[in-house]
Regions:
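Active-site-proximal region of nucleotide-activated glycan assembly enzymes
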Residues: 123-185
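Conserved acidic residues
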Residues: 8, 105-107, 168
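A short, glycine/small-residue-rich beta-strand->loop->alpha-helix junction that serves as a flexible
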Residues: 14-27, 51
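Hydrophobic/aromatic beta-strand patches that form the interior of the parallel beta-sheet core
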Residues: 43-45, 61-63, 110, 137, ...
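Conserved nucleotide-sugar donor-binding subdomain of glycosyltransferases
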Residues: 78-119
């Protein structure tokens, strides 16, 4: 079906670490998109065990990837529920994210907080969609970590090349006069 005769599609990757802020923010964005344009379909990718508890407007659905949890004592990740190693869980998550992007064929892909996802899991989907010409957006909250700490983390994770080579836009959620989270990067 030609892109012009099908509904507009937005894929959102919701970082699913501890807390509900990421899923709540993605839900708010999804609800605003379908409210603004009833021809839009939004699909949210998340590993949050709480995503199914949220109420979504018509035109929104979600794919829950296998969950992971960060161990408080070690800072390492582990599979949340499955009795498989975290590497196996991450491989499943990466494939589900990429395959969902491939099949859903979004007109826009929004990634929340983590530019490459947890352990780079969004990278294959980003490259696939970039090759197709899909606009790629990184969404960041207005208040983030200390700039020096964030710069070190992004250097270690090789984020700056991904921002330059993959993303078309970076959206900052919040009031620009309050905070500029990319200062110092």
């Amino acid at each position: 079906m030609p892109a012009s005769s099908r509904s507009k599609r937005v894929l959102i990757y919701s970082h699913d670490s501890f807390g509900l802020g990421h899923v709540s923010r993605c839900r708010t964005i999804a609800n605003a998109l379908v409210e603004a344009d009833q021809s839009v379909s939004v699909l949210i990718l998340s590993g949050s065990p709480m995503i199914g508890s949220y109420e979504f407007r018509s035109g929104i659905d979600f794919v829950r990837v296998p969950g992971v949890v960060k161990q408080i004592d070690t800072g390492e990740y582990d599979s949340a529920n499955l009795r498989v190693g975290v590497e196996h869980t991450m491989e499943m998550r990466t494939r589900i994210i990429r395959d969902t992007a491939d099949i859903f064929r979004p007109d826009l892909f929004i990634v929340d907080k983590e530019p490459l996802g947890l352990r780079g899991e969004v990278g294959p989907a980003l490259r696939l969609l970039k090759d197709r010409g899909t606009p790629l957006v990184l969404g960041l909250r207005d208040v983030m970590d200390d700039p020096a700490a964030l710069a070190q983390e992004w250097e270690r994770k090789k984020i700056v090349p991904a921002l330059r080579d993959l993303y078309d836009e970076i959206w900052i959620y919040g009031l620009p006069q309050i905070n500029k989270p990319l200062t110092g990067i």
